[in-house]
Design a protein with these regions (language model features):
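Residue-level marker of positions within ordered structural domains that often coincide
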Residues: 34, 104, 285
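Substrate-binding cleft of secreted/luminal carbohydrate-active enzymes
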Residues: 246-310
Length: 310
């Protein structure tokens, strides 16, 4: 995946937008007395140059299969109503490795369409079970099992790439049930990712997790961050190559000199210096979407910081 490839696609997109703008301008100025509907058709990069798209996505998949620092993001997919394109997977950075859908219960036809593009890019898509936030919805173990059975069926039906989950530290029984059920359902190539403090997962179950996203999204200083990493890799026994650090878009992170940095980019630096660890997990990415020059500037910069030669 080279900058030339990206620039070629971006150039094509701008050309398409310019042609559309000229067409709209001509239609608007041709008759000032009548209002006329103008059809607008979005042309995806794959439709502009299919041969180049195939070459580009093959390079992306090769990159994601190579040894590199991972980038992972949560996405609240397909809300009702949708605010903008930021609500859809197709607008995520191409180099993103894993996306966890936090509204996967409402997986839409737009999500289904985007899955084709995600897999072309080699991006893995997970169904998030946010038990920590939704515990009250499950009256008992039977209700949780029924829900998990539905999750497993949805992952299979929509060709998702596995599961992510959170846990209630005061409900070890539910956590054990989630791990047992989802790890048993996981097929070859699928992932099981836990988001939180690994000490809240039974020691015997930690080996069943492919990755752990450490709950560092609210951490604001490096001293605390270092202690969290030591606890995860030491007391909890999570191998560094399985540990990702979480950071929220828009949040601050203060270094050893109490200098403020954007949490996402500074956390990316710490993935390297405190490990090397597996990678970075970005939360609240809707706060990072809009920018004058490009979408997701912080997340894109973090990906480049972690993998500058890729």
């Amino acid at each position: 995946m080279t900058n030339a490839m990206k620039n070629h696609i971006i150039t094509n997109l701008f050309r398409c937008m310019a042609v559309s703008a000229l067409a709209l301008g001509a239609a608007a100025c041709s008759d000032w007395t009548e209002t006329e509907a103008v059809e607008q058709q979005v042309q995806r990069p794959a439709d502009q140059d299919s041969a180049f798209w195939a070459e580009y996505t093959a390079a992306l998949r090769e990159y994601k299969q190579s040894e590199h620092f991972l980038t992972y993001a949560r996405l609240y997919n397909s809300p009702t109503p949708s605010a903008s394109e930021k609500d859809y997977m197709r607008c995520l950075p191409d180099s993103l490795d894993i996306v966890s859908l936090t509204n996967a219960d409402n997986f839409s036809r737009f999500d289904a369409e985007d899955m084709v593009t995600m897999h072309e890019k080699g991006t893995r898509v997970l169904y998030q079970v946010d038990y920590a936030a939704r515990k009250a919805e499950f009256a008992d173990a039977a209700a949780l099992k029924t829900y998990l059975d539905g999750v497993i069926a949805a992952v299979a039906a929509n060709d998702l790439d596995g599961y992510s989950f959170t846990a209630d530290p005061l409900d070890a029984t539910a956590t054990a049930s989630i791990v047992a059920t989802l790890s048993a359902a996981k097929t070859d190539g699928q992932l099981l990712v836990y988001e939180g403090n690994p000490l809240f997962v039974a020691e015997a179950d930690r080996a069943k997790l492919d990755y752990v996203v450490l709950d560092t999204e609210a951490t604001t200083d490096i001293t605390t961050l270092k202690l969290q990493v030591v606890n995860a890799t030491g007391y909890a026994g999570i191998a560094p190559e399985r540990l990702l650090l979480a950071a929220a878009a828009g949040a601050p992170l203060y270094d050893e000199e109490v200098v403020e940095h954007a949490a996402i980019t500074e956390m990316a630096e710490r993935v390297v210096s405190l490990g090397p660890l597996a990678g970075l997990a970005a939360y609240d990415i809707d706060n990072d979407y809009y920018d004058v020059e490009r979408n997701y500037p912080l997340l894109s910069d973090a990906i480049q910081l972690l993998n500058p030669s890729k």
